[in-house]
Curated annotation (Swiss-Prot):
Name the UniProt record assigns to this protein: Salivary gland broad-spectrum antiviral protein
Superkingdom of this protein's organism: Eukaryota
Cell membrane found in the keyword field: no
Membrane topology listed for this record: Single-pass membrane protein
Induction info: (Microbial infection) Up-regulated in salivary glands following infection with dengue virus type 2, Zika or chikungunya viruses (at protein level).
Disulfide bonds, paired cysteine numbers: none
Parts of the chain that traverse the membrane: 17-37
KO phenotype (gene knockout): (Microbial infection) RNAi-mediated knockdown results in higher levels of Zika virus replication in salivary glands after infection.
Cellular compartments per GO CC: membrane
Keyword Glycoprotein (UniProt): yes
Tissue specificity of this protein: Salivary gland (at protein level).
Amino acid sequence: MDSAASHSVACHSTKMVALGLYFTVVVFVLFITSVNLQSPATKTEKTPKISRLYFGTLEYVNATKDQELIDGVFDAILKRLNKLDVDNPHEKNVGRYDMTTLLCWAVNNDLLYRKYGENMEVIFQLAKKFYPERDDKDKDSLGINRSLGTSKLLKWELHG
């Protein structure tokens, strides 16, 4: 082999080794990142962090027009909100965010009229749980439910 060919092979081998080392580092970094993301709690936390519910996800569920799926997601959100601990500041904050997201999803959503109507009392209790400072003495659950969903219920009652 002449020196030019030998030099070319050596350069190619060096580049392959460097590329291999680069990929090894990338894979290691991705592995460490995924382990940290999957870890339920870091060393400084005593409890796992709870993620927020994202409106875009609910829009996607709505776009399926699968009533059983939509009802199941709605029920799962209510169940999750019931489990959150308002004495934990992080969970209370997540609960407030998710409660607002749930109400935004339910507003003017033809696919949730029935489900919302069936769960108005639960939604009212959850609103009191996450927003106790809004518990006005002159409002009862019926008055608040009316202000949250009057047009929704009227439309639901008219269209069944």
